[in-house]
């Protein structure tokens, strides 16, 4: 992908990131850790439950030297069944867990452990950038779960850090980017199997967590939970409630990015990769009511933002797309695009999630993570058969995303989803949330990183940080 936006090469865009990251001054940083191909990598994990445990399970061949989690008792519950008996399949992970140094605060971990080569960051969204920046400034390679950052400014800040230290190996946790099916989708779209694509639809069944709800009253927190560290950079403290932690934080404005942030990296990834549309030039969102709001449809966000709307439709216009103007529409909360008249009855849009590309010579549809691509239209199969394999395949596909990062750290292969790829993708997703919070369509200049038609909406490209947790 040589030209990420019209008139600008990717190098131009990367080089300009510092100028568009606000007034942030990035201090000097340590050189990236060098690891021999024969060595095991010293890995730390921040957020060792949930996705962090899944990531760690893929990395037990390495040295898991440190873990940081705000509720280590909760993490330990994953190793036993409902009766307290050990789960045999979890024992390799438990062995790694038992050997690792443990912290509740990753800032203390970074200060005290000088042997960390690489870190997995699998915290709630509002911690991602703060933890990643702290690691990168120490020369530590980073694997950051999706969505990469909570704000546009954070993404551009991390990209500038990566640009200044090109030996740092960075990876976003959108594992579908390493999958064989998704890579074939990109080849087919670029190879013209369905002709020129000017319309894309992407959808998900999320949320699977509280969203569109009023903020609950605080309750007593579990004794094992360090609530102050869980809040971290969040500028508000509503008090603990299980609707926030664990897992359920995704739908609450101070902590997560909603359904678009949670699943966009597994769906929007492929059209952005294949079509190289650059920055969206216009974004408009229609949605159900905000949590705590009484309006049913397109109600203005309440002053005290609680949870995101349960469902939304976000339309992106890419006026500078490489192949000509492109429209991409996102649906969540169970909403789906209308079935095209040309869609055969044998082709079914998966209600769990998928992407539909509408070309002038046919259509292509796939599930989440780029899986199970289906070609639709006369002559499409024949044209697809003629499209050569051009992208490298990752060992073990999407199940090998973590080890691709390790092998890249060792210098054995190219990284799959580095920040140079992940930041522009993440920015596209975030602009949908900005339009939602601005409560009106926004027009965006990707080169400057500014909203041009609604000046006050630019505040949503950044955020406030709690004292002691600033980026």
What are these regions (language model features)?
Residues 223-403, 407, 413, 427-433, ...:
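Glycine-rich, aromatic-lined ligand/substrate-binding cores of catalytic
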Residues 14, 56, 76-79, 107-110, ...:
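Non-transmembrane alpha-helical segments in soluble domains
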Residues 141, 149-224, 229:
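A contiguous active-site-proximal alpha/beta segment in oxidoreductase catalytic domains
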Residues 54-59, 77-80, 130-134, 153-155, ...:
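Short, solvent-exposed loop/turn and secondary-structure capping segments
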Residues 103, 122-127, 148-150, 155, ...:
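Short, solvent-exposed turn/loop segments enriched in Gly/Ser/Thr/Pro and often Arg
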Residues 15-36, 307, 407-471:
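C-terminal helix-rich "cap/oligomerization" subdomain common to oxidoreductases
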Residues 2-140, 156-169:
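N-terminal glycine-/serine-/threonine-rich beta1-alpha1-beta2 phosphate-ribose binding loop
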């Amino acid at each position: 992908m040589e030209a990420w936006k019209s008139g600008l090469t990717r190098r131009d865009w990367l080089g300009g990131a510092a100028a568009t990251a606000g007034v942030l001054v990035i201090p000097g940083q340590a050189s990236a850790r060098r690891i021999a191909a024969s060595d095991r990598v010293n890995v730390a994990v921040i957020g060792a439950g949930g996705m962090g445990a899944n990531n760690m399970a893929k990395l037990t061949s390495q040295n898991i030297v440190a873990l940081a989690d705000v509720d280590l008792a909760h993490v330990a519950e994953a190793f036993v069944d409902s009766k307290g008996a050990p789960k045999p399949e979890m024992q390799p992970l438990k062995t790694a867990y038992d050997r690792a140094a443990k912290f509740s605060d990753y800032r203390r971990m970074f200060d005290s452990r000088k042997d960390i080569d690489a870190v997995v960051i699998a915290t709630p969204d509002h911690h991602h950038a703060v933890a990643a920046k702290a690691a990168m400034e120490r020369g530590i390679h980073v694997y950051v779960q999706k969505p990469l950052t909570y704000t546009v400014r954070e993404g551009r800040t991390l990209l500038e850090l990566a640009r200044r230290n090109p030996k740092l190996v960075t990876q976003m946790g959108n594992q579908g980017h390493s999958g064989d099916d998704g890579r074939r989708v990109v080849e087919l779209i670029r190879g013209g199997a369905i002709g020129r694509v000017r319309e894309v639809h992407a959808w998900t069944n999320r949320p699977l967590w509280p969203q569109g709800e009023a903020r609950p009253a605080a309750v007593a927190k579990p004794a094992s939970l360090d609530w102050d560290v869980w809040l971290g950079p969040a500028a508000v403290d509503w008090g603990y409630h299980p609707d926030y932690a664990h897992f359920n934080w995704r739908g609450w404005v101070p902590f997560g990015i909603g359904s678009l942030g949670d699943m966009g990296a597994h769906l929007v990834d492929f059209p952005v990769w294949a079509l190289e549309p650059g920055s969206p030039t216009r974004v408009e969102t229609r949605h159900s009511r905000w949590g705590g709001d009484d309006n049913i449809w397109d109600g203005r966000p309440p002053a005290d933002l609680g949870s995101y709307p349960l469902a939304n439709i976000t339309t992106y216009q890419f006026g500078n797309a490489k192949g000509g103007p492109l429209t991409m529409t996102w649906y969540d909360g169970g909403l789906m695009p209308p079935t095209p008249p040309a869609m055969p009855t044998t082709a079914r849009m998966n209600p769990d999630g998928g992407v539909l590309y509408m070309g002038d010579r046919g259509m292509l549809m796939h599930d989440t993570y780029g899986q199970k691509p289906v070609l639709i239209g006369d002559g499409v199969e024949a044209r697809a058969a003629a499209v050569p394999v051009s992208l490298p395949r990752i060992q073990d596909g999407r199940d090998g995303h973590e080890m691709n990062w390790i092998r890249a750290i060792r210098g054995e292969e190219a990284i799959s989803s580095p920040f140079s790829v992940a930041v522009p993708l993440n920015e596209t997703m975030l602009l949908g949330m900005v339009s939602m919070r601005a409560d009106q369509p926004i027009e965006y200049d990707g080169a400057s990183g500014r909203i041009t038609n609604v000046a006050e909406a630019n505040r949503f490209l950044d955020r406030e940080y709690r004292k002691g947790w600033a980026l």
